[in-house]
């Protein structure tokens, strides 16, 4: 029998993702400023698409960096 680990998402099911919410978006970005995959963060397909669009929009508006220089 196979047991799957239940993933804990940082989002509630009905919570919307906004590009202005930088603290929330930073939870889904690695140290190298890459977007974390859906497998790792436990989001649904719809939430992952919204997240990717919001992160990309925030990068274009210079709210998030494209690459961390640390």
From Swiss-Prot:
Q: Does the keyword Nucleotidyltransferase apply?
A: no
Q: Which residues form a coiled coil?
A: none
Q: Which InterPro entries match?
A: Ribosomal_bS18, Ribosomal_bS18_sf
Q: The organism sits in which domain of life?
A: Eukaryota
Q: Which Pfam families match?
A: Ribosomal_S18
Provide the protein's localization. Plastid, Chloroplast
Q: Which GO terms describe its biological process?
A: translation
Claim: Plastid is one of the keywords in the record: yes
GO MF entries? small ribosomal subunit rRNA binding; structural constituent of ribosome
Q: How does it assemble?
A: Part of the 30S ribosomal subunit.
Protein name (record): Small ribosomal subunit protein bS18c
Q: Which organism is it from?
A: Gracilaria tenuistipitata var. liui
């Amino acid at each position: 029998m196979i047991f799957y680990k239940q993933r804990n998402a940082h989002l509630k099911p009905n919570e919307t993702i906004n590009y202005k919410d930088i603290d929330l978006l930073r939870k889904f970005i690695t140290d190298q400023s890459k977007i974390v995959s859906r497998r790792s963060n436990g989001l649904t397909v719809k939430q992952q698409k919204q997240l990717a669009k919001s992160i990309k929009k925030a990068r274009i508006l210079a709210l998030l960096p494209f690459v961390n220089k640390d």
